[in-house]
Curated annotation (Swiss-Prot):
The gene is RPL13AB. GO terms for cellular component: cytosol; cytosolic large ribosomal subunit; cytosolic ribosome; plasmodesma. Belongs to the universal ribosomal protein uL13 family. GO terms for biological process: translation. This is Large ribosomal subunit protein uL13y. It comes from the Eukaryota.
Length: 206
């Protein structure tokens, strides 16, 4: 997944935790236009520069933008973190053209890490990480926290599900570590039993 240098054939899963919203959206928008399929998980952990009060005031100003005669015609004000991020990416893509619509269709966004993506290797994007891009000491807030302040009702539910997922993941890791240890022990015992026969096996590259 490198912009302009080639397309990865399989879908890329990006862990959005502690990435800056705009920087992450711009990189993903470019990849989508290049033909890459992208899944973004943990959207509630995306960072916005500026404190929570400031960001909430900005969002409340955005809520006042509507069509006077028929507000349901737009603009649509999303509350869920995944949909807010999706809209940010949409703003960086010519989504009203055929190419742009196809690019946007290649994007999937989620709060938390739902199956089957909990068993898939996830990647980060260094160019968008908060620790590398936000000035030290600068205020920031999480997108999930902002969403919960403006009408998103599932913040606590997602947090509970994430705790359960991490517990399952830790148990799986411990089991895998134990199996690796047993395998290494079994290989050592086999080497001691085989002795000189190992040289014969090595010569035929077994």
């Amino acid at each position: 997944m490198v912009s302009g240098s080639g397309i990865c054939s399989k879908r890329v899963v990006v862990d959005a935790r502690h990435h800056m919203c705009g920087r992450l959206a711009s990189i993903i928008a470019k990849e989508l236009l290049n033909g890459q399929s992208v899944v973004v998980v943990r959207c509630e952990e995306i960072c916005l520069s500026g404190g929570l009060v400031r960001q909430k005031m900005k969002y409340m100003r955005f809520l006042r933008k509507r069509m006077n005669t028929k507000p349901s015609h737009g603009p649509i004000h999303f509350r869920a973190p995944s949909k807010i991020f999706w809209r940010t990416v949409r703003g960086m893509i010519p989504h009203k053209t055929k190419r742009g619509a196809a690019a946007l269709a290649r994007l999937k966004v989620f709060e938390g890490v739902p199956p089957p993506y909990d068993k898939v290797k996830r990647m980060v994007i260094p160019d968008a990480l908060k620790v590398l891009r936000l000035q030290a000491g600068h205020k920031y807030c999480l997108l999930g926290r902002l969403s919960s302040e403006v009408g998103w009702n599932h913040y606590d539910t997602i947090k509970e599900l994430e705790v359960k997922r991490k517990e399952r993941s830790q148990a799986l890791y411990e089991r895998k570590k134990q199996l690796t240890k047993l395998r290494a022990k079994a290989e050592k015992v086999a080497e001691e039993k085989l002795g000189s026969q190992l040289d014969v096996l090595a010569s035929i590259k077994y």
